[in-house]
Amino acid sequence: HKWMRYVNRLLDETDPHVAKMTALNLGFQAAFYGTKTIRKMREVHDCNIPWLILMDPTSACNLHCTGCWAAEYGNKLNLSFDELDSIVTQGKELGIYFYMMTGGEPLVRKADIIKLCEKHNDCAFHCYTNGTLVDQKLCDDMKRVGNLSLSISLEGFEDANDFRRGEGVYDKVLHAMD
């Protein structure tokens, strides 16, 4: 069965430190401890508290995709590291231990994202990325911190993807996935 093969491959190929951090941060911190704290904070503050926070560290992007809003904003909308840190710190006080990042292209800020992962190693971080800024150093840093995962987007096969995102982007993304 294809799903069983996928799960076995995932278990076989995932770095043990990354698997441990995922289990601890999503399984214990977010699902168990976080949920308990969220329920308490909902009563204290008399409002809904989400189980994750979605944030855009930057509006900047290294691509200029046809029809994308990011090119209209340029590189001027950025949360500082201190602002990102404050969001996570306040979120943890409410019981939130899962943070998703979009953009722009969040990996334009990969040094700050890794720094955030190091500082808040009890949290899980996930970035939606075009994949073109994934390099060996980032992969090594992700393996070291263990609490950052990526979703890499494509527009379809090479012709459709490169028509919208630019020539050669499809190949860069496939290389990043290796």
Residue locations for each model-derived region?
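Canonical Radical SAM [4Fe-4S] cluster-binding loop centered on the CxxxCxxC motif
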Residues: D46-N48, L52-D82
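A generic structural signal for short
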Residues: R42-E43, I53, N75-K76, H126-C127, ...
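A broad, low-specificity signal for short, low-complexity segments enriched in glycine/proline
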Residues: D12-A19, L26-Q29, C61-N62, I87, ...
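N-terminal start-of-chain detector that recognizes signal peptides
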Residues: L24-A30, A71, Y97-Y99, N121-A124
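N-terminal [4Fe-4S]-dependent radical SAM core
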Residues: K2-L54
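Radical SAM/AdoMet-radical enzyme domain recognition
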Residues: F81-M101, R109-D178
